[in-house]
Swiss-Prot record:
SUPFAM superfamilies attached to this UniProt entry: ClpP/crotonase (SSF52096)
Protein name (Swiss-Prot/TrEMBL): ATP-dependent Clp protease proteolytic subunit
Catalyzed reactions: Hydrolysis of proteins to small peptides in the presence of ATP and magnesium. alpha-casein is the usual test substrate. In the absence of ATP, only oligopeptides shorter than five residues are hydrolyzed (such as succinyl-Leu-Tyr-|-NHMec, and Leu-Tyr-Leu-|-Tyr-Trp, in which cleavage of the -Tyr-|-Leu- and -Tyr-|-Trp bonds also occurs)
Function: Cleaves peptides in various proteins in a process that requires ATP hydrolysis. Has a chymotrypsin-like activity. Plays a major role in the degradation of misfolded proteins.
Active-site feature positions: 106 (nucleophile), 131
NCBIfam families given in the database record: clpP (TIGR00493), PRK00277.1 (NF001368), PRK12553.1 (NF009205)
Annotated source species: Shewanella baltica (strain OS155 / ATCC BAA-1091)
Record's subunit section: Fourteen ClpP subunits assemble into 2 heptameric rings which stack back to back to give a disk-like structure with a central cavity, resembling the structure of eukaryotic proteasomes.
UniProt-listed InterPro entries: ClpP, ClpP/crotonase-like_dom_sf, ClpP/TepA, ClpP_His_AS, ClpP_Ser_AS
Amino acid sequence: MHNASDIQSALVPMVIEQTAKGERSYDIYSRLLKERIIFLVGQVEEHMANLIVAQLLFLESESPDKDIFLYINSPGGSVTAGMAIYDTMQFIKPNVSTVCIGQAASMGAFLLAGGEKGKRHCLPNSRVMIHQPLGGFQGQASDIAIHAKEILGIKNKLNQMLAEHTGQPLEVVERDTDRDNFMSATQAVEYGLVDSVMTKRG
C-alpha cells in the first residue's frame, strides 16, 4: 500500500543534464533550486516551513548577493510555520522576490506581501485572499480565554505587519481582514500586496 507522499514523489519529473563528467539527473525542484527558485505549494505547515527555511539558508550561503525567487501557490495554514518562513526571508541577505501562481490565501498572502518591495508579483489569473487568523481551540473555559487572547495578539501583530508591507493605514487593514477578502491580481497590486502583474518574462 502506497501512501500519498510516495505517490506524489513518484509523480515529480526528473530532468537529465549533460555535464563534462556525463549525465546527471535531478528532480525538477532540485534543478530549479540551482536557478534560485523555491516553490511554496500547498498548506503552510511545520515540515514544509522547515524545508523552505533550509532552502533559503542554503541559497544565502551559495550567493548572498543574488536574489531568491519564491513561487507561492498556497491556501495558507499555520501562523507559526508561516512566521518561521517570513522571519527567515527578512533575516537573510539576498532579496526574496515573491510570485503568486494560482492562489495565495491567508498566510500565503502574508508571505507574498513579505517579499522585497518592488519584487513582489502575481501572474494574471492568480487570486489573493486576506483574513484574520482562525481560532478553533476547545477545552476548559480558562484555557479558551488564554487562547482567545493569544489569537487577538497574533491578529493585531499580523495586521500591523500587513499595513507596513502594503502601505495601507492600519484601520483599513483591520477592516479588510475582518472577513475573507478575495482579490484579483490587479486588485492585489492596487492594495499594495504586490507590486506588479506579470504576463510575460521581461
